[in-house]
């Protein structure tokens, strides 16, 4: 059970990491759009 929880946590961290990257790219794109 502990192993499953750890694996589950890693999956969540990975998903959050991807989300953060997408959010950053979206903000960057928005700023570029406004500046352009």
UniProtKB/Swiss-Prot annotation:
This is Dolichyl-diphosphooligosaccharide--protein glycosyltransferase subunit 2. Signal peptide: none annotated. Its main location: endoplasmic reticulum. Keywords: Endoplasmic reticulum, Membrane, Transmembrane. Belongs to the SWP1 family. One of its GO terms (biological process) is protein glycosylation. It is found in: Endoplasmic reticulum; Endoplasmic reticulum membrane. GO terms for cellular component: endoplasmic reticulum membrane. Subunit of the oligosaccharyl transferase (OST) complex that catalyzes the initial transfer of a defined glycan (Glc(3)Man(9)GlcNAc(2) in eukaryotes) from the lipid carrier dolichol-pyrophosphate to an asparagine residue within an Asn-X-Ser/Thr consensus motif in nascent polypeptide chains, the first step in protein N-glycosylation. N-glycosylation occurs cotranslationally and the complex associates with the Sec61 complex at the channel-forming translocon complex that mediates protein translocation across the endoplasmic reticulum (ER). All subunits are required for a maximal enzyme activity. It is a multi-pass membrane protein. Pathway: Protein modification; protein glycosylation. It comes from the Eukaryota. Component of the oligosaccharyltransferase (OST) complex. The gene is RPN2. Transmembrane segments: none annotated.
